[in-house]
């Protein structure tokens, strides 16, 4: 049997982290079993589904590198197929037309509620004689009246639901459109889905869908219903806990590897291991190892993972993701060092790519003013002599290398008989405009000789003016 999984989001909003984790689990199960992963867009809610949401879902999946083997399929393009099956079911007697008005159904529910009974359709039209063609009606699935639906969930174990608890589900509306639960069944059947990984909020749908599959003579997939993700306060994860959209994490400077690594651990583990490559996840992941307890989202842990990946991944790869943030912050990288070199220089300090981009601006753009606090502290009168001497030594360099720059700074401190800080701190403020940067040798090397000399000259004039004022 070829394992075939699917991710089937509804395009009524962005791809949120809960959906991304479900997609990841489904993708991993397919890859771990040399199977296939299908992307399906469940857009039957015509009022709420939007193309913007479809685009956001596809963008999120692509950014996460969760590639699909089939799709994306769209349910709205398969209405003829769904109606074909419904018509076959009407002929076979596994579905029937229901002519009950909304008013009658509401009255039935009120009466059931008053008696403390479970509110469900009372079967009024089940077995009723056909009425005139064209009379408004819905089509209901003829749910079995006795027995139970039993299935073994990979996460929750054996689940059993008595059929008497289930309704005769509407599978086609009055306007002729098929309903969500029915479309899902036909899609899973037609697409050969063997394993359905989805959120626990779908558990109530599963016995209904299994009964329809049985009525169609279709194979029953295996199911894994994963628990919801909670905020750190124990409440359901929402916008008040911070970002919930996958692409918001991109915008905030996270790498896809960090988010994937974090999401997979929200409900799954492999020993005490915290950090996984995608190859390791494919090797180790098993549906049966998913924990059924809800997991709390910890933003600090995600930030820690992101910092790890910024440092650990190939600088060329990180630079490709950093480029988006440079453009987003309006930084023109065409006149300056290679982004990969900047990543190498700044990765030890940066927790996010957004932060890294902001802190790298001085490599590409000249600044109008020095940071006021840093200038007050380090560009004082005593800095004039060290700045002038290091300026001369740097100007004399024939090779603009890290080693040569370091030697020039060291020689300046030695000749003036001062500590390296007396040279280094004014020089750092001079060339960066602020008080933080990587080592001065690599900072100057990346800024370049001409730009460095220009900035040091500006700092010398600044200190001189300060002395004379």
From Swiss-Prot:
Listed PROSITE patterns: AA_TRNA_LIGASE_I (PS00178)
Top-level EC class as recorded in UniProt: ligase
Keyword DNA damage carried by entry: no
Swiss-Prot/TrEMBL keywords: Aminoacyl-tRNA synthetase, ATP-binding, Cytoplasm, Ligase, Nucleotide-binding, Protein biosynthesis
Main location: cytoplasm
One Gene Ontology cellular component: cytosol
Residue numbers binding ATP: 239
GO MF annotation: an example: ATP binding
GO BP annotation list: glutamyl-tRNA aminoacylation
Motif 'KMSKS' region location, chain numbering: 236-240
Catalyzed reactions: tRNA(Glu) + L-glutamate + ATP = L-glutamyl-tRNA(Glu) + AMP + diphosphate
Top-rank lineage group of the source organism: Bacteria
Motif ('HIGH' region): 9-19
Enzyme Commission no: 6.1.1.17
Pfam family, one: tRNA-synt_1c
Protein localization: Cytoplasm
Subunit structure: Monomer.
Family, as annotated: Belongs to the class-I aminoacyl-tRNA synthetase family. Glutamate--tRNA ligase type 1 subfamily.
Alphabetized NCBIfam families for the sequence: gltX_bact, PRK05710.1-3
Function: Catalyzes the attachment of glutamate to tRNA(Glu) in a two-step reaction: glutamate is first activated by ATP to form Glu-AMP and then transferred to the acceptor end of tRNA(Glu).
PANTHER family: GLUTAMATE--TRNA LIGASE (PTHR43311), GLUTAMATE--TRNA LIGASE, MITOCHONDRIAL-RELATED (PTHR43311:SF2)
Record protein name field: Glutamate--tRNA ligase
Species of the source: Shewanella amazonensis (strain ATCC BAA-1098 / SB2B)
Lineage of the organism: Bacteria, Pseudomonadati, Pseudomonadota, Gammaproteobacteria, Alteromonadales
């Amino acid at each position: 049997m070829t394992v075939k999984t699917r991710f089937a989001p509804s395009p009524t909003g962005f791809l949120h982290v809960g959906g991304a984790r479900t997609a990841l689990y489904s993708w991993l199960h397919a890859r771990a079993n040399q199977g296939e992963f299908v992307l399906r867009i469940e857009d039957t809610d015509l009022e709420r589904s939007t193309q913007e949401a479809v685009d956001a879902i596809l963008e999120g999946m692509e950014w996460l590198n969760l590639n699909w083997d089939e799709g994306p399929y769209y349910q709205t393009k398969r209405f003829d197929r769904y109606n074909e099956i419904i018509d076959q079911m009407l002929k076979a007697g596994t579905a029937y037309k229901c002519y009950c008005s909304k008013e009658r159904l509401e009255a039935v529910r009120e009466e059931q509620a008053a008696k403390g009974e479970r509110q469900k359709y009372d079967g009024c039209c089940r077995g009723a004689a056909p009425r005139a063609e064209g009379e408004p009606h819905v089509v209901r699935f003829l749910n079995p009246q006795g027995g139970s639906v039993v299935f073994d969930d990979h996460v929750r174990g054996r689940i059993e639901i008595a059929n008497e608890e289930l309704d005769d589900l509407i599978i086609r509306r009055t306007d002729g459109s098929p309903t969500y639960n029915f479309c899902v069944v036909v899609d899973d059947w037609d697409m050969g889905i063997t394993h359905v990984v989805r959120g626990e909020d779908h558990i109530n749908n599963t016995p209904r869908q299994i009964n329809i599959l049985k009525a169609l003579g279709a194979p029953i997939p295996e199911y894994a219903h994963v628990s919801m993700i909670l905020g750190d306060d124990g409440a359901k994860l929402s916008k008040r806990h911070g970002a919930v959209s996958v692409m918001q994490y991109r915008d905030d400077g996270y790498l896809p590897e960090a988010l994937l690594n974090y999401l997979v651990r929200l409900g799954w583990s492999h020993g005490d291991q915290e950090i996984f490559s995608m190859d390791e996840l494919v090797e180790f992941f098993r549906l049966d190892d998913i924990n059924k307890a809800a997991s709390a989202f910890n933003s600090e842990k995600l930030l820690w993972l992101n910092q790890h990946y910024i440092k650990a991944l190939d600088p060329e790869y990180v630079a490709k993701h950093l480029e988006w943030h440079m453009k987003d912050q309006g930084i023109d990288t065409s006149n300056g060092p290679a982004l990969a070199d900047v990543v190498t220089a700044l990765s030890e300090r940066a927790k996010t790519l957004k932060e890294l981009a902001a802190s790298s601006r001085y490599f590409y753009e000249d600044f109008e003013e020095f940071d006021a606090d840093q200038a007050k502290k380090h560009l004082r009168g005593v800095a004039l002599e060290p700045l002038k001497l290091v300026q001369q030594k740097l100007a004399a360099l024939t090779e603009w290398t890290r080693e040569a720059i370091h030697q020039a700074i060291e020689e300046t401190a030695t000749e003036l008989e001062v500590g390296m800080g007396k040279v280094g701190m004014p020089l750092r403020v001079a060339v960066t405009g602020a008080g933080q940067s990587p080592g001065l040798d690599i900072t100057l090397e990346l800024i370049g000789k001409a730009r460095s000399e220009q900035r040091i000259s500006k700092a010398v004039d600044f200190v001189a003016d300060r002395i004379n004022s």
